Amino acid sequence: MRNVKYGKCVRCGKTYDAVPDLTNCTCGGILDIVYDYDYIKSVLTKEKLAKRDNRSMWRYRELLPVEETTPDTPLRVGWSPLYEEPKLAELLGIKKLWVKDDGQNPTASLKDRASAMAVAKAMEAGAKTIACSSTGNAASSLAGNAAAAGIKTYIFVPERAPKGKVAQLMIFGANVISVKGNYEDTFKMSAAAIDKYGWYNRNAAINPYLSEGKKTVALEIAEQLNWEMPDYLAISVGDGCTIAGVWKGFKDLYAIGFIDKLPRLISAQSLGCYPINRAIQEDKPWEPMEENTIADSISVGVPRNADKALMAIRESNGIAVNVSDEEILAAQRLLGRTCGVFGEPAGVTGAAALKKACEEGLIPHDATVVSVVTGNGLKDVANAIKSAGEPIHIEPDLELMVEEFKKRGVTVE
Protein backbone atom coordinates (compact mmCIF):
# COMPACT_ATOMS: atom_id res chain seq x y z
CA MET A 1 0.00 0.00 0.00
CA ARG A 2 1.83 3.10 -1.22
CA ASN A 3 -0.45 5.41 0.77
CA VAL A 4 0.26 3.72 4.12
CA LYS A 5 3.50 4.00 6.08
CA TYR A 6 2.90 1.71 9.06
CA GLY A 7 0.82 1.01 12.13
CA LYS A 8 1.89 2.92 15.24
CA CYS A 9 1.02 2.21 18.86
CA VAL A 10 -0.80 5.14 20.44
CA ARG A 11 0.61 4.17 23.84
CA CYS A 12 4.34 3.44 23.34
CA GLY A 13 4.99 4.61 19.77
CA LYS A 14 6.27 1.28 18.44
CA THR A 15 5.69 0.80 14.70
CA TYR A 16 4.58 -2.26 12.74
CA ASP A 17 4.35 -3.19 9.07
CA ALA A 18 0.78 -2.72 7.87
CA VAL A 19 0.04 -6.38 7.16
CA PRO A 20 -3.62 -7.42 6.69
CA ASP A 21 -3.89 -9.23 10.04
CA LEU A 22 -2.37 -6.43 12.12
CA THR A 23 -3.60 -6.32 15.72
CA ASN A 24 -2.53 -4.72 19.01
CA CYS A 25 0.96 -3.69 20.10
CA THR A 26 2.95 -6.05 22.33
CA CYS A 27 2.48 -3.48 25.13
CA GLY A 28 -1.28 -3.88 24.80
CA GLY A 29 -1.78 -0.51 23.14
CA ILE A 30 -4.03 0.13 20.16
CA LEU A 31 -2.41 0.82 16.80
CA ASP A 32 -3.13 3.76 14.53
CA ILE A 33 -2.62 3.58 10.77
CA VAL A 34 -0.15 6.24 9.63
CA TYR A 35 -0.45 7.56 6.07
CA ASP A 36 1.93 9.15 3.58
CA TYR A 37 0.03 12.39 3.13
CA ASP A 38 2.49 13.76 0.57
CA TYR A 39 1.81 10.77 -1.66
CA ILE A 40 -1.94 11.05 -1.14
CA LYS A 41 -1.88 14.74 -2.08
CA SER A 42 -0.08 13.81 -5.29
CA VAL A 43 -2.79 11.36 -6.40
CA LEU A 44 -6.05 12.75 -4.96
CA THR A 45 -7.71 16.11 -5.55
CA LYS A 46 -11.20 17.42 -4.86
CA GLU A 47 -11.78 17.67 -8.60
CA LYS A 48 -10.76 14.06 -9.20
CA LEU A 49 -13.01 12.90 -6.38
CA ALA A 50 -16.00 14.89 -7.66
CA LYS A 51 -15.86 13.06 -11.01
CA ARG A 52 -16.21 9.62 -9.46
CA ASP A 53 -19.46 7.74 -9.94
CA ASN A 54 -18.76 5.38 -7.04
CA ARG A 55 -21.20 6.35 -4.31
CA SER A 56 -19.82 4.15 -1.55
CA MET A 57 -17.12 4.36 1.10
CA TRP A 58 -14.65 3.02 -1.47
CA ARG A 59 -14.69 6.32 -3.38
CA TYR A 60 -12.03 7.38 -0.83
CA ARG A 61 -9.59 4.53 -1.55
CA GLU A 62 -6.54 6.81 -1.48
CA LEU A 63 -7.34 7.53 2.17
CA LEU A 64 -8.01 3.89 3.08
CA PRO A 65 -5.60 1.08 4.03
CA VAL A 66 -6.35 -1.33 1.18
CA GLU A 67 -4.26 -2.64 -1.68
CA GLU A 68 -4.94 -1.19 -5.12
CA THR A 69 -5.86 -4.69 -6.34
CA THR A 70 -8.37 -5.34 -3.56
CA PRO A 71 -11.91 -5.18 -5.00
CA ASP A 72 -14.71 -3.16 -3.46
CA THR A 73 -16.79 -5.27 -1.09
CA PRO A 74 -20.10 -6.51 -2.60
CA LEU A 75 -22.61 -4.51 -0.52
CA ARG A 76 -22.83 -0.76 -1.15
CA VAL A 77 -21.73 0.69 2.15
CA GLY A 78 -21.65 4.43 2.74
CA TRP A 79 -22.80 7.63 1.06
CA SER A 80 -25.73 7.74 3.45
CA PRO A 81 -27.97 10.82 3.30
CA LEU A 82 -27.09 14.06 5.07
CA TYR A 83 -30.27 16.04 5.71
CA GLU A 84 -30.35 19.73 6.56
CA GLU A 85 -32.91 20.17 9.34
CA PRO A 86 -33.93 23.84 9.76
CA LYS A 87 -36.98 23.04 11.94
CA LEU A 88 -34.95 21.12 14.48
CA ALA A 89 -32.14 23.69 14.36
CA GLU A 90 -34.65 26.41 15.26
CA LEU A 91 -36.09 24.28 18.04
CA LEU A 92 -32.61 23.72 19.50
CA GLY A 93 -31.68 27.38 19.09
CA ILE A 94 -28.69 26.90 16.77
CA LYS A 95 -27.85 28.32 13.35
CA LYS A 96 -27.75 25.13 11.26
CA LEU A 97 -28.17 21.42 11.84
CA TRP A 98 -27.62 18.43 9.59
CA VAL A 99 -28.56 14.85 10.41
CA LYS A 100 -26.41 12.09 8.91
CA ASP A 101 -28.59 8.98 8.72
CA ASP A 102 -26.23 6.02 8.75
CA GLY A 103 -29.12 3.71 9.48
CA GLN A 104 -29.50 3.64 5.69
CA ASN A 105 -26.49 1.35 5.28
CA PRO A 106 -27.05 -2.26 4.07
CA THR A 107 -27.52 -3.81 7.52
CA ALA A 108 -28.87 -0.54 8.96
CA SER A 109 -25.95 0.80 10.98
CA LEU A 110 -22.69 2.71 10.77
CA LYS A 111 -20.93 -0.54 11.73
CA ASP A 112 -21.18 -1.59 8.08
CA ARG A 113 -18.25 0.72 7.39
CA ALA A 114 -16.01 -1.22 9.77
CA SER A 115 -17.29 -4.59 8.60
CA ALA A 116 -16.71 -3.77 4.94
CA MET A 117 -13.13 -2.89 5.84
CA ALA A 118 -12.79 -6.12 7.83
CA VAL A 119 -14.01 -8.15 4.86
CA ALA A 120 -11.57 -6.37 2.53
CA LYS A 121 -8.62 -7.02 4.84
CA ALA A 122 -9.71 -10.62 5.44
CA MET A 123 -9.71 -11.16 1.68
CA GLU A 124 -6.19 -9.70 1.51
CA ALA A 125 -5.12 -12.07 4.29
CA GLY A 126 -6.68 -15.04 2.51
CA ALA A 127 -8.92 -15.72 5.51
CA LYS A 128 -11.95 -17.96 5.13
CA THR A 129 -13.53 -17.11 8.49
CA ILE A 130 -14.06 -13.85 10.41
CA ALA A 131 -15.13 -13.56 14.05
CA CYS A 132 -16.10 -10.82 16.49
CA SER A 133 -17.93 -10.00 19.69
CA SER A 134 -20.74 -7.49 19.58
CA THR A 135 -23.69 -6.01 21.43
CA GLY A 136 -25.63 -6.43 18.19
CA ASN A 137 -24.87 -4.02 15.35
CA ALA A 138 -21.30 -5.11 14.62
CA ALA A 139 -22.55 -8.68 14.63
CA SER A 140 -25.32 -8.23 12.07
CA SER A 141 -23.08 -5.94 10.05
CA LEU A 142 -20.27 -8.46 9.85
CA ALA A 143 -22.70 -11.29 9.11
CA GLY A 144 -24.25 -9.44 6.18
CA ASN A 145 -21.06 -8.11 4.65
CA ALA A 146 -19.24 -11.42 5.05
CA ALA A 147 -22.17 -13.39 3.61
CA ALA A 148 -22.11 -11.23 0.49
CA ALA A 149 -18.39 -11.95 0.12
CA GLY A 150 -18.74 -15.69 0.76
CA ILE A 151 -16.85 -15.66 4.06
CA LYS A 152 -17.93 -17.72 7.09
CA THR A 153 -18.56 -15.91 10.40
CA TYR A 154 -18.55 -16.79 14.09
CA ILE A 155 -20.18 -14.11 16.20
CA PHE A 156 -20.37 -13.79 19.98
CA VAL A 157 -23.19 -11.72 21.49
CA PRO A 158 -24.26 -11.11 25.11
CA GLU A 159 -27.55 -12.80 25.92
CA ARG A 160 -29.22 -9.37 26.37
CA ALA A 161 -28.72 -8.53 22.66
CA PRO A 162 -32.08 -7.52 21.10
CA LYS A 163 -33.81 -10.39 19.35
CA GLY A 164 -34.20 -8.35 16.18
CA LYS A 165 -30.45 -7.98 15.84
CA VAL A 166 -29.82 -11.65 16.60
CA ALA A 167 -32.45 -12.67 14.04
CA GLN A 168 -30.80 -10.45 11.44
CA LEU A 169 -27.40 -12.06 11.80
CA MET A 170 -28.91 -15.55 11.90
CA ILE A 171 -30.65 -14.82 8.59
CA PHE A 172 -27.23 -13.93 7.18
CA GLY A 173 -26.00 -17.41 8.10
CA ALA A 174 -23.67 -16.51 10.94
CA ASN A 175 -22.66 -19.04 13.56
CA VAL A 176 -23.99 -17.25 16.65
CA ILE A 177 -22.77 -17.87 20.19
CA SER A 178 -24.95 -16.18 22.84
CA VAL A 179 -22.86 -15.68 25.97
CA LYS A 180 -24.45 -15.66 29.43
CA GLY A 181 -22.77 -12.51 30.67
CA ASN A 182 -22.05 -8.89 29.81
CA TYR A 183 -20.14 -7.43 26.87
CA GLU A 184 -16.77 -7.90 28.60
CA ASP A 185 -17.48 -11.61 29.09
CA THR A 186 -18.52 -11.85 25.45
CA PHE A 187 -15.38 -10.06 24.26
CA LYS A 188 -13.12 -12.39 26.25
CA MET A 189 -14.90 -15.45 24.84
CA SER A 190 -14.46 -14.22 21.28
CA ALA A 191 -10.79 -13.41 21.87
CA ALA A 192 -10.13 -16.88 23.26
CA ALA A 193 -11.89 -18.56 20.34
CA ILE A 194 -10.12 -16.39 17.76
CA ASP A 195 -6.79 -17.28 19.34
CA LYS A 196 -7.65 -20.99 19.37
CA TYR A 197 -8.93 -21.27 15.79
CA GLY A 198 -6.96 -18.55 14.02
CA TRP A 199 -10.01 -16.73 12.65
CA TYR A 200 -9.65 -13.22 11.21
CA ASN A 201 -10.33 -10.76 14.03
CA ARG A 202 -13.05 -8.15 13.43
CA ASN A 203 -13.06 -6.82 16.99
CA ALA A 204 -12.79 -3.07 16.56
CA ALA A 205 -10.46 -2.40 19.48
CA ILE A 206 -8.04 -5.11 18.33
CA ASN A 207 -8.07 -4.60 14.57
CA PRO A 208 -6.75 -1.08 13.77
CA TYR A 209 -8.19 -1.11 10.26
CA LEU A 210 -11.80 -0.95 11.42
CA SER A 211 -11.72 2.64 12.64
CA GLU A 212 -10.32 3.46 9.19
CA GLY A 213 -13.56 2.12 7.74
CA LYS A 214 -15.62 4.08 10.23
CA LYS A 215 -13.79 7.30 9.41
CA THR A 216 -15.46 7.32 5.99
CA VAL A 217 -18.57 8.79 7.63
CA ALA A 218 -16.48 11.90 8.33
CA LEU A 219 -15.09 11.96 4.78
CA GLU A 220 -18.63 11.84 3.41
CA ILE A 221 -19.91 14.57 5.70
CA ALA A 222 -17.11 16.87 4.59
CA GLU A 223 -17.72 16.21 0.90
CA GLN A 224 -21.51 16.48 1.24
CA LEU A 225 -21.03 19.88 2.91
CA ASN A 226 -18.75 20.96 0.05
CA TRP A 227 -15.77 20.87 2.42
CA GLU A 228 -17.25 23.52 4.74
CA MET A 229 -16.86 22.08 8.21
CA PRO A 230 -19.52 22.34 10.94
CA ASP A 231 -18.54 23.76 14.30
CA TYR A 232 -19.59 20.60 16.15
CA LEU A 233 -20.29 16.94 15.45
CA ALA A 234 -22.41 14.89 17.87
CA ILE A 235 -22.11 11.11 17.95
CA SER A 236 -22.87 8.25 20.32
CA VAL A 237 -19.94 6.50 21.99
CA GLY A 238 -19.59 2.93 23.24
CA ASP A 239 -16.32 1.10 22.66
CA GLY A 240 -14.77 4.33 21.36
CA CYS A 241 -13.92 3.13 17.85
CA THR A 242 -16.51 5.26 16.05
CA ILE A 243 -15.64 8.64 17.57
CA ALA A 244 -11.94 7.84 17.11
CA GLY A 245 -12.57 7.01 13.46
CA VAL A 246 -14.59 10.17 12.87
CA TRP A 247 -11.78 12.30 14.27
CA LYS A 248 -9.20 10.42 12.18
CA GLY A 249 -11.22 11.13 9.05
CA PHE A 250 -11.36 14.85 9.70
CA LYS A 251 -7.64 14.94 10.54
CA ASP A 252 -6.82 13.12 7.30
CA LEU A 253 -8.75 15.69 5.27
CA TYR A 254 -7.06 18.53 7.14
CA ALA A 255 -3.63 16.98 6.52
CA ILE A 256 -4.16 16.85 2.74
CA GLY A 257 -5.63 20.35 2.60
CA PHE A 258 -9.24 19.43 1.78
CA ILE A 259 -10.62 21.28 4.83
CA ASP A 260 -9.28 24.28 6.73
CA LYS A 261 -10.75 23.65 10.19
CA LEU A 262 -11.68 20.76 12.46
CA PRO A 263 -15.03 20.43 14.26
CA ARG A 264 -15.37 19.95 18.00
CA LEU A 265 -16.72 16.55 18.97
CA ILE A 266 -19.72 16.00 21.22
CA SER A 267 -19.22 12.61 22.88
CA ALA A 268 -22.63 11.19 23.76
CA GLN A 269 -23.02 8.42 26.32
CA SER A 270 -25.84 7.08 28.46
CA LEU A 271 -25.97 7.81 32.18
CA GLY A 272 -26.32 4.05 32.53
CA CYS A 273 -22.81 3.48 31.15
CA TYR A 274 -20.39 6.35 30.51
CA PRO A 275 -16.78 5.32 31.29
CA ILE A 276 -15.24 7.41 28.49
CA ASN A 277 -17.20 10.55 29.29
CA ARG A 278 -16.50 10.15 32.99
CA ALA A 279 -12.77 10.14 32.24
CA ILE A 280 -13.19 13.42 30.32
CA GLN A 281 -15.40 15.05 32.93
CA GLU A 282 -13.20 14.08 35.88
CA ASP A 283 -9.90 14.40 33.96
CA LYS A 284 -8.82 10.97 35.12
CA PRO A 285 -7.95 7.65 33.48
CA TRP A 286 -11.05 5.71 32.47
CA GLU A 287 -12.40 3.02 34.77
CA PRO A 288 -14.89 0.21 34.07
CA MET A 289 -18.59 0.80 34.75
CA GLU A 290 -21.69 -1.31 35.07
CA GLU A 291 -23.81 -1.62 31.91
CA ASN A 292 -27.37 -0.42 32.49
CA THR A 293 -28.97 1.35 29.54
CA ILE A 294 -31.55 0.70 26.84
CA ALA A 295 -28.96 1.92 24.30
CA ASP A 296 -27.55 -1.58 23.91
CA SER A 297 -25.14 -0.76 21.08
CA ILE A 298 -23.20 1.64 23.32
CA SER A 299 -23.64 -0.27 26.57
CA VAL A 300 -19.93 -0.99 26.97
CA GLY A 301 -18.58 -0.90 30.50
CA VAL A 302 -15.02 -1.77 29.49
CA PRO A 303 -14.33 0.24 26.30
CA ARG A 304 -11.50 -1.40 24.39
CA ASN A 305 -10.83 1.65 22.23
CA ALA A 306 -10.88 4.18 25.06
CA ASP A 307 -7.34 5.47 24.41
CA LYS A 308 -8.12 6.61 20.86
CA ALA A 309 -11.55 7.93 21.85
CA LEU A 310 -10.17 10.03 24.69
CA MET A 311 -7.43 11.39 22.45
CA ALA A 312 -10.03 12.37 19.85
CA ILE A 313 -12.30 14.16 22.31
CA ARG A 314 -9.43 16.02 23.95
CA GLU A 315 -7.66 16.95 20.71
CA SER A 316 -10.91 18.38 19.33
CA ASN A 317 -11.57 20.35 22.53
CA GLY A 318 -14.73 18.31 22.64
CA ILE A 319 -17.67 18.09 25.02
CA ALA A 320 -18.74 14.98 26.95
CA VAL A 321 -22.50 14.80 27.55
CA ASN A 322 -24.35 12.05 29.42
CA VAL A 323 -28.06 11.50 28.86
CA SER A 324 -30.70 9.41 30.59
CA ASP A 325 -32.65 6.64 28.90
CA GLU A 326 -35.69 8.93 29.04
CA GLU A 327 -33.78 11.67 27.21
CA ILE A 328 -32.70 9.12 24.61
CA LEU A 329 -36.29 8.01 23.98
CA ALA A 330 -37.38 11.65 23.79
CA ALA A 331 -34.70 12.28 21.16
CA GLN A 332 -35.93 9.25 19.23
CA ARG A 333 -39.41 10.78 19.08
CA LEU A 334 -38.03 14.24 18.30
CA LEU A 335 -35.99 13.06 15.31
CA GLY A 336 -38.87 10.99 14.02
CA ARG A 337 -41.45 13.76 14.31
CA THR A 338 -39.36 16.69 13.08
CA CYS A 339 -36.99 15.00 10.61
CA GLY A 340 -38.64 11.74 9.59
CA VAL A 341 -35.52 9.87 10.70
CA PHE A 342 -36.02 6.70 12.76
CA GLY A 343 -33.01 5.80 14.87
CA GLU A 344 -32.50 3.13 17.49
CA PRO A 345 -31.74 4.31 21.06
CA ALA A 346 -27.95 4.14 20.64
CA GLY A 347 -28.31 5.70 17.21
CA VAL A 348 -30.03 8.83 18.54
CA THR A 349 -27.94 9.28 21.67
CA GLY A 350 -25.87 11.88 19.81
CA ALA A 351 -29.02 13.89 19.12
CA ALA A 352 -30.09 13.55 22.76
CA ALA A 353 -26.71 14.85 23.90
CA LEU A 354 -26.87 17.74 21.43
CA LYS A 355 -30.30 18.75 22.73
CA LYS A 356 -29.07 18.63 26.31
CA ALA A 357 -25.91 20.58 25.46
CA CYS A 358 -28.02 23.28 23.80
CA GLU A 359 -30.34 23.47 26.80
CA GLU A 360 -27.37 23.82 29.15
CA GLY A 361 -25.84 26.64 27.09
CA LEU A 362 -22.82 24.61 25.98
CA ILE A 363 -23.48 25.26 22.28
CA PRO A 364 -23.57 28.88 21.02
CA HIS A 365 -26.64 30.03 19.10
CA ASP A 366 -24.62 30.75 15.95
CA ALA A 367 -23.19 27.20 15.85
CA THR A 368 -23.44 24.77 12.95
CA VAL A 369 -23.76 21.10 13.94
CA VAL A 370 -23.91 17.63 12.40
CA SER A 371 -25.60 14.89 14.42
CA VAL A 372 -24.91 11.33 13.30
CA VAL A 373 -27.64 8.70 13.65
CA THR A 374 -25.64 5.49 13.87
CA GLY A 375 -28.38 2.85 13.61
CA ASN A 376 -31.94 2.34 12.38
CA GLY A 377 -34.87 2.20 14.79
CA LEU A 378 -36.18 -1.09 13.43
CA LYS A 379 -33.23 -2.79 15.11
CA ASP A 380 -34.89 -2.32 18.50
CA VAL A 381 -38.66 -2.37 18.06
CA ALA A 382 -39.40 -3.02 21.74
CA ASN A 383 -37.86 0.26 22.84
CA ALA A 384 -39.37 2.06 19.86
CA ILE A 385 -42.82 1.01 21.10
CA LYS A 386 -41.87 2.14 24.60
CA SER A 387 -40.89 5.51 23.13
CA ALA A 388 -43.81 6.01 20.75
CA GLY A 389 -46.63 4.49 22.78
CA GLU A 390 -49.56 2.39 21.64
CA PRO A 391 -51.99 3.18 18.80
CA ILE A 392 -55.63 4.08 19.40
CA HIS A 393 -57.58 0.81 19.66
CA ILE A 394 -61.25 0.95 18.56
CA GLU A 395 -64.05 -1.16 17.17
CA PRO A 396 -64.81 -0.69 13.44
CA ASP A 397 -67.27 2.16 14.13
CA LEU A 398 -66.65 5.74 12.96
CA GLU A 399 -68.71 7.29 15.76
CA LEU A 400 -66.68 5.42 18.35
CA MET A 401 -63.52 6.74 16.70
CA VAL A 402 -64.84 10.32 16.90
CA GLU A 403 -65.67 9.86 20.59
CA GLU A 404 -62.22 8.43 21.26
CA PHE A 405 -60.64 11.42 19.48
CA LYS A 406 -62.57 13.75 21.80
CA LYS A 407 -61.46 11.84 24.91
CA ARG A 408 -57.83 12.03 23.84
CA GLY A 409 -57.95 15.62 22.62
CA VAL A 410 -57.04 14.61 19.07
CA THR A 411 -57.41 17.57 16.69
CA VAL A 412 -58.50 16.66 13.18
CA GLU A 413 -57.49 19.05 10.39
Regions found by a protein language model. Give the residues of each.
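PLP-dependent amino-acid enzyme catalytic core
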Residues: M1-E413
